């Protein structure tokens, strides 16, 4: 219903993370200082629309997923393998209603195995076993239902309303969301209310916030030039770790309160090499955005200012700041508020071989990204190292640690035709850990199927070993 806009891989603002934990299929990054902002992401199809696409155009009547946890399962948070199916009702060209159903296959099999009819050495008849299966299929705790209504209010305005219920109970611990999006010629305006809001922190842990509301005004991603974000975020209620009975300390930014973030950045690109071999005229590339061999570098510099009012005041983040992470900061205890400003930077390298047109091995793509999210820490560390070297002194490990970037690398290789394999991983550098200063974290493996007829779209089957999650999804205009 709404036109797609391309999300560039070099854009500095974080995207929502895909996750099968909920029916909606996404989790927002926990806001931090300076990044993530908390509401900054690319346009994507809603989960019901993705599932409907697989049903209609890819001959997939059931969509599988796996997650070790599920909301409100009532069995200690256990998840497992599940299947999804959607029913859509297009009432008009401007109004689409969908009902997304999810069946917990793993729990169903587990419950069946516990019954006497399927026990070891059982002499039950076929009729008895079928009766047992039918009885368990009626167990509403095996099902989750998601109602979604999408309105195209105007060519530039959309409204999405969703209501998800688990264990077949529409009133017990539901998850609801309302999203309004307006597209200006050069900007996107998004207003969102979620109850509860699902967030994921940097350790991969999920948190529920009883009520989360946000308004985001963002300029569209550009190949080069300035961009900005204005983000107003309000939390209400005490956050709780998903499927945890213990009272754990939540990230400060999820506590009740109001925060306002203003971020500006400038991006520049430079081609080191671009292939001149003519493309095949007899066939189209599998993906138009992956059809040009090249080697390019890009850089982003920017700054973020944050004002917080309430329990989510940024004061607690600086009291425990042992590494000098925080930038310029002020705190006003009398009104329970604070202010912070910091700089940030990013450098990236992309190298691609092949036009992604031939049937075999016509695409090899490598991407490396260095993030410097705390400009003041980097500046103080670089200054300290430079002074020590000029004075013929050995720089300290603490100074070197401050200038170490956050690293993300990805490699994509065509296998056959539109199929390609992709692996993405973060690299953490901790020079103070002499035994293991470099660790690989947040690795994700994926098989991608390029949908050639849609120019730049792909069906993605991904697996995250850290979170033990498996998911099938549809993505548009993303590299």
From Swiss-Prot:
Annotated localization: Plastid, Chloroplast outer membrane; Endoplasmic reticulum
Deletion consequences: Stunted, pale yellow and infertile plants, which accumulate oligogalactoglycerolipids and phosphatidates.
GO BP field: acylglycerol transport; ER to chloroplast lipid transport
Effect listed in the UniProt record for changing residue 20 to L: In tgd4-1; accumulation of trigalactosyldiacylglycerol (TGDG) in leaves and slightly pale green phenotype
Membrane topology: Single-pass membrane protein
TM spans (from-to): 288-310
Any Gene Ontology CC annotation: cytosol
Comment text on domains: Amino acids 110-145 are necessary and sufficient for phosphatidic acid binding, while amino acids 1-80 are only necessary.
Subunit structure: Homodimer. Forms dimeric beta-barrel. Interacts with TGD5.
Role: Involved in lipid transfer from the endoplasmic reticulum (ER) to plastids. Specifically binds phosphatidic acid (PtdOH).
Protein name, as recorded: Protein TRIGALACTOSYLDIACYLGLYCEROL 4, chloroplastic
């Amino acid at each position: 219903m709404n036109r797609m806009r391309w999300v560039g891989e070099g854009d500095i603002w974080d995207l929502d993370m895909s996750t099968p934990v909920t029916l909606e299929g996404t989790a927002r990054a926990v806001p931090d200082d300076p990044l993530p902002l908390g509401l900054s992401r690319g346009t994507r199809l809603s989960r019901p629309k993705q599932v409907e696409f697989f049903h209609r155009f890819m001959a997939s009547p059931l969509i599988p997923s796996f997650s070790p946890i599920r909301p409100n399962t009532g069995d200690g948070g256990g998840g497992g393998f599940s299947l999804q199916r959607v029913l859509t009702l297009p009432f008009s060209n401007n109004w689409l209603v969908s009902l997304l159903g999810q069946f917990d296959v793993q729990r169903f099999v587990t419950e069946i195995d516990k019954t006497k009819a399927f026990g070891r050495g059982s002499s039950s008849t076929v009729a008895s076993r079928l009766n047992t299966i039918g009885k368990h299929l009626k167990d509403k705790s095996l099902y989750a239902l998601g109602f979604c209504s999408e309105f195209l209010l105007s060519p530039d305005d959309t409204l999405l309303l969703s209501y998800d219920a688990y264990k077949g109970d529409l009133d017990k611990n539901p998850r609801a969301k309302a999203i309004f999006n307006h597209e200006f010629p050069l900007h996107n305006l998004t207003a969102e209310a979620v109850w509860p809001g699902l967030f994921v922190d940097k350790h991969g842990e999920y948190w529920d916030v009883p009520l989360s509301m946000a308004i985001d005004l963002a300029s569209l991603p550009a190949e080069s030039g300035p961009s900005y974000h204005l983000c107003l975020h309000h939390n209400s209620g005490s956050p709780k770790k998903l499927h945890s009975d213990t009272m754990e300390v939540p990230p400060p930014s999820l506590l009740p309160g109001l925060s306002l973030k203003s971020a500006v950045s400038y991006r520049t690109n430079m081609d080191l090499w671009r292939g001149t071999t003519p493309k095949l005229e007899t066939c189209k590339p599998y993906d138009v955005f992956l059809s040009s061999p090249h080697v390019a570098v890009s850089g982003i510099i920017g700054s973020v200012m944050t004002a917080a009012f309430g329990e989510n005041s940024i004061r607690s983040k600086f009291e425990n700041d042992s590494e000098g992470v925080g930038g310029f900061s002020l705190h006003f205890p009398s009104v329970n508020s604070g202010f912070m400003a910091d700089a940030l930077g990013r450098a990236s390298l992309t190298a691609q071989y092949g036009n992604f047109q031939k049937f075999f091995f016509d695409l090899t793509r490598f991407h490396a990204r260095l993030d410097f999210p705390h400009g003041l820490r980097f500046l103080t560390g670089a200054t300290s190292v430079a002074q020590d070297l000029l004075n013929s002194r050995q720089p300290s490990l603490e100074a070197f640690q401050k200038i170490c970037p956050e690293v993300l690398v990805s490699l994509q290789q065509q296998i056959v035709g539109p199929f390609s394999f992709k692996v993405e991983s973060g690299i953490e550098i901790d020079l103070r850990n002499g035994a293991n200063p470099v660790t690989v974290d947040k690795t994700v493996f994926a098989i991608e199927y390029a949908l050639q007829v849609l120019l730049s779209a792909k069906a993605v089957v991904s697996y995250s070993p850290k979170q033990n999650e498996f998911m099938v999804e549809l993505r548009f205009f993303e590299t």
